[in-house]
Amino acid sequence: MEKIQRICSLVLLAAFWGCVPVLHAQSFDKLWKQVEQAQEKSLPQTVIKLTDEIFRKGEREKNTPQMLKAYMCRNTYQNILTPDSFYVNLKGLEQWALHEQNPVSRAVLNSLVASIYANYADNNRWELRNRTSLNLGETALPADIREWSANLFVNQVIKYTGEALKDSTELLKTSSRTYIPFVILGDASEYYHHEMYHLLASRAIDALQKVSWFDTDSLVKKDIMGIYGQMINTYRKMPDREDAAVLTMLDYMAWRNREGDVLLRPRAVKEGESEAPNQYLRALDRIIKDYGKRDVCAEAYLAKARYYRNMRKYPEAVSYTHLRAH
C-alpha cells in the first residue's frame, strides 16, 4: 500500500528509562565513534571488543538502551566470525527477556526474539517446507533450532509476539522518543503520538507475516487479525487518536486484500443493481464519512483511486485523485 512513510524504523530496539547524564552520553558517544571507525576499517574483532566494553559499561550504569544496542551489534559481528554463535546469542536474548523486570523493556526484548525466529524461518523457507511437522510441547523442543520443523517456528513467533504486546497499557504510555537514537521517527510517527504500542504491534504483524507461509491451521492469520482489531478498538476509544485509527484501518484492509480475503471477492448482483456491492469500497466510504475532515483521510481517497486504477476504471481513479488534491 502506497501510504504515508511508516511510523518508526527500528534500527536497534532498546529501552531507555529516565535521562542519561550528559557525561555518560558523551562517553558512550565516544565509544560508538570508535565502533564506527572499526566498522569502516573492516575490523570485526575490534567491533566485538568495543561493543562488549559498551555493554559492560551500560550494565554497570544500568543503562538498558546502551546494553541492548551493544548486545545486538556484538552479536552481528560474532555471527559473521562464528556462525554457530547465533544460536547461543539467541538463547541469551531469550533469557534476558525472561528475567527482565521492566514491562516495556521486556516487551522490546520479546519483540526482538520474535523477529529473530521469524527471519530465520523465512530465510530457510525452502528447507523447512520439506520437513515433517514435529508435534512437540515447549519443554520437548530440540535444543538446536536447526532440527526444528516449520510449525515449531510458527509457535515461537506466536508466543513471543504475544508476550511483546501483553502489557499494551504500558506501551501506550511510553513514547518512542525516549528510544532515540535507537528508533528513528518516521514522517507518520506523530499520527500515533510516538507511542511504543503501535511500533511493537507493527513489528509483531511483520514477524507473523513472515511465518504465515507455514501456517496450516490459520493460527497466524487469526493472531494478525486480533492485533489489528485490538489496535483499531484501542485507537477508536482514545479521543486524540483519530488519525491512528484511520491509518490502522487502512493497513488492516490492505492486508486483507493482499490475503485475497472476502473484501475483494465478487458478489452476486441483486436485481435492479448495476454492479455488485463491494465491501472494500464501502469500508473506505465509511472511513471518509467518519473522518473526512481530517487531513489523514486523504489516504482513504488514494486507496479508492488505486482500487479503481487496478480495476481499469480510469475516470473514477482520476476523480478520487482529484478529490484528494483538494
Annotate the PLM regions:
Residues 321-326:
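Conserved small/polar residues in nucleotide/adenosyl-binding loops
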Residues 25-50, 64-65:
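N-terminal leader/linker segments that initiate helical-solenoid repeat arrays
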